[in-house]
A protein has these predicted regions:
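Conserved catalytic cysteine-centered active-site region
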Residues: 1-36, 68-93, 166-203
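Active-site-proximal alpha-helical scaffold in enzymes
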Residues: 3-7, 14, 20-55, 93-109, ...
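Conserved small-residue
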Residues: 10, 30, 37, 66, ...
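Fold-independent oxyanion-binding glycine-rich loops
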Residues: 13-14, 52-55, 96-97, 105-106, ...
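Condensing-enzyme catalytic core mediating Claisen C-C bond formation in acyl metabolism
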Residues: 77-151, 155-156, 256
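A beta-strand-loop signature enriched in Asp, Gly, Thr, and Trp
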Residues: 127, 138-192
Length: 256
């Protein structure tokens, strides 16, 4: 009931008259909302859909959970070391925030970006927070989104990279299995924002859109100078959630 009330009050504030719904699918919640909105529009049941995610996990209870799991960062320079494959310990740092986007069908003039493909998958898990060592669910979601999109046309990938040793290795393995030697430039925003859990997917989409609009690859500072693409036309966004689920969304540069 509390969860549903969040979306209904957003609708009330905006004066929306269409359907209102909420869901919670752990760290991929926001991008599952994007999938949901696409389904409503594709079915003809909605002309446009407002989608997004919100999370406020900076509570004593949630922090205690993360520390009990022994995945929380001990601090230092850049305490949240997403994509640092040389790190020896878990470096989770929680963040909070919210993000929303308006989806419309077709290619609209002035659109920030265009969604040209989506993928999703679920894998069997050993326990609630586990993921296979090779990131099978993410591999399959990327293969689905790239069905019809040549992998070598993807200029960058916004990684999920939750900054735990096991899952960081798993998501990297999945990307390497899909792209191989043609792996695009990789980036993330978690070093700056922390892991915003259910909001993280929409904030990753925001990062992708910013790079596409400004034609500037945003690198991770502690990884050293990365040779980013000279031109950005397509960016793949990945999200993984507890429960063995993954979502991949490919964004293409919009026409402003």
């Amino acid at each position: 009931t509390t969860l549903g009330n969040i979306s209904s009050w957003v609708a009330q504030d905006l004066g929306a008259s269409g359907p209102v719904l909420s869901h919670s699918i752990t760290c991929s919640t926001a991008v599952h909302a994007v999938l949901n909105g696409i389904a409503w529009i594709t079915s003809g049941m909605a002309k446009r859909f407002l989608v997004g995610g919100s999370e406020a996990p900076l509570t004593a209870f949630t922090l205690a959970q993360m520390k009990a799991l022994k995945i929380y960062s001990k601090g230092g320079n850049y305490p949240c070391r997403a994509l640092d494959m040389a790190k020896q310990t878990n470096t989770m740092v929680l963040g909070e925030g919210a993000g929303m986007a308006c989806l419309e069908p077709g290619r609209k003039k002035g659109a920030l970006a265009c969604i040209i493909g989506v993928g999703y998958a679920t894998e069997p898990i050993a326990h609630g927070a586990s993921m296979s060592a090779d990131g099978d669910c993410l591999k399959r979601s990327m293969e689905m989104v790239l069905n019809g999109i040549p992998p070598d046309t993807v200029d960058a990938v916004v990684m999920h990279a939750p900054v735990t040793l096991k899952v960081d290795r798993a998501v990297m393995e999945a990307v390497l299995r899909v792209f191989g030697k043609e792996t695009p430039a990789l980036t993330t925003n978690k070093w700056k924002l922390g892991h915003t859990l259910g909001t993280s997917g929409i904030l990753s989409m925001e990062l992708a859109i910013l790079m596409l609009r400004h034609q500037h690859f945003i690198e991770v500072p502690y990884l050293g100078k990365v040779s980013g693409p000279e031109k950005l036309e397509r960016v793949l966004v990945n999200a993984v959630g507890f429960g063995g689920n993954a979502v991949s969304i490919c964004l293409e540069r919009g026409t402003l």
